[in-house]
Amino acid sequence: MGQKIHPTGFRLAVTKNWSSRWYANSKDFPGMLNEDIKVREYLKRKLAHASVGRVLIERPAKNARVTVYSARPGVVIGKKGEDIEQLRTDLQRIMGVPVHVSIEEIRKPEIDAQLIADSIAQQLEKRIMFRRAMKRAMQNAMRLGAQGIKVMSAGRLNGAEIARSEWYREGRVPLHTLRADIDYATSEALTTYGIIGIKVWVYKGDMLDRNEQPVAEEPAADDRRPRRTPGRPDGDKPRTRTVKKVDGAADPAKRVRKAGA
């Protein structure tokens, strides 16, 4: 059921890692999980125009470390670091512990699934044709080195009365291969006709460990036997059949046809 399950959850502890990394006992776990959800909602709302791909939350000892992966780190930091200081203050108020905020730049936003989904959603909200937005995103991803990409939109596409879903794929997207590095993300476009959901799968290559970089697949050598040409395999030469004689065996008796028989 690799086609149905969440690609990231399917690969956790194999080639993917958790987005929240901390341990807690049964008494503190619900509160800390609720804090993580509030932090992610706050960052999504606060940094809506900063092209945030993902957020990593870690809790070493009595502190917290929040890493924001963004394609526009300058927007997150702000002028002379004013915005990041305000961000740190708000996160400390939500989490109740000292928070260290770090910003990581996304080098290739064209192959980041979350940024692709958000970009398509923004274009749909600006009344751009959904097919054009999807195909443009796929072309950019393949040009920047993605091995394959699949994009699906669902809802009242082009303002149709009946909701439907359409998807396009380019290259390979092996969802059932555990070693395949599949980046998956979703987004929503709030249009005048209702919500349109966008799902994006990006195949970046194969990896054997969580800490390894994905490796692009090499095309397999074609070791199949050449196909026979129509007709006889050796041209017009008649086929000959060779019969091996077993040692000690008598020659087969010839059939003699008697006259008058």
Swiss-Prot record:
Comp. bias (Basic and acidic residues): 221-254
One GO CC term on file: cytosolic small ribosomal subunit
Keywords (A to Z) from UniProt: Ribonucleoprotein, Ribosomal protein, RNA-binding, rRNA-binding
MF annotations from Gene Ontology: mRNA binding; rRNA binding; structural constituent of ribosome
Domain KH type-2 positions: 39-107
PROSITE patterns per UniProt: KH_TYPE_2, RIBOSOMAL_S3
Keyword Ribonucleoprotein attached: yes
Thylakoid in keyword set: no
Subunit structure, as described in the record: Part of the 30S ribosomal subunit. Forms a tight complex with proteins S10 and S14.
NCBIfam families assigned to the protein according to its UniProt record, in alphabetical order: rpsC_bact (TIGR01009)
HAMAP family from the UniProt entry: Ribosomal_uS3_B
Primary role: Binds the lower part of the 30S subunit head. Binds mRNA in the 70S ribosome, positioning it for translation.
Protein name in the entry: Small ribosomal subunit protein uS3
Organism field: Dechloromonas aromatica (strain RCB)
